[in-house]
A protein has these predicted regions:
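A short glycine-rich, Lys/Arg-flanked "PGG" loop and its adjoining helix->strand segment in the class I
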Residues: 95-106
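Conserved Class I S-adenosyl-L-methionine
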Residues: 123-143
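Core SAM-dependent methyltransferase catalytic element
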Residues: 148-165
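A short SAM/SAH-binding and catalytic strip from SAM-dependent methyltransferases
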Residues: 80-93
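Class I SAM-dependent methyltransferase SAM/SAH-binding core
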Residues: 20-71
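A short acidic, Gly/Pro-enriched loop at the edge of an enzyme's catalytic core
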Residues: 72-81
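Conserved alpha-helix/loop element of class I SAM-dependent methyltransferases that forms part
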Residues: 1-15
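Conserved beta-strand signature within the Rossmann-like core of class I S-adenosyl-L-methionine
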Residues: 107-115
Length: 165
């Protein structure tokens, strides 16, 4: 998560920024952000059990359940969305990520990680390009990052901005 948090910090120097931690899990990313001085963090996750653990950290403004493969309703209130450990082997994911754009203020960015094995196995880069052409967004950065280091699986870090409407 550190590479994604570092990227988000470079994009958002203001600690007053409002951030959505999509797929917040137990709250590890939120805690890293909180420790850097960000205090306006909301979290969404698929698992009620994970959300309970995130709630116990007492760092999120709000927490809620959301499934990115279903419909996700977001208001455009976020300066950034960070999504760590969510994207991997599912061919719909490069298309699902555009659902998060609804939560972004104009000019805001999505910072996401992708499991490197999934990136390779389903040819994420090609699918991401198809999604970009279909939905209109700018991939500002794709970089290699450590991911599941104990399993020796690398990852990708993406910085994406929707095109202005």
């Amino acid at each position: 998560p550190h590479a994604a948090v570092d990227a988000l910090e470079r994009l958002l120097p203001s600690r007053d920024s409002v951030i959505l931690d999509m797929g917040c899990g137990t709250g590890l990313v939120g805690e890293l952000l909180h420790n850097l001085g960000y205090h306006h963090i909301d979290g969404l996750d698929l698992s009620p059990e994970m959300l309970e653990k995130a709630k116990a950290r007492r760092i999120y403004r709000t927490l809620g359940e959301a499934d990115l493969t279903a419909s996700v309703t977001l208001d455009p209130v976020y300066d950034a969305v960070i999504c760590v450990g969510v994207f991997s082997h599912h061919r719909s994911q490069p298309f699902d990520l555009v659902k998060l754009f609804a939560g972004l203020k104009p000019g805001a960015a999505l910072v996401a990680t992708v499991n490197g094995k999934g990136w390779r196995d389903i040819d994420w880069e090609t699918l991401l390009e198809q999604s970009r052409r279909e939905h209109g967004f700018n991939v500002e950065n794709i970089s290699d990052i450590p991911y599941l280091t104990q399993q020796d699986i690398p990852g990708k870090l993406l910085v994406i901005r929707p095109n202005p409407s």
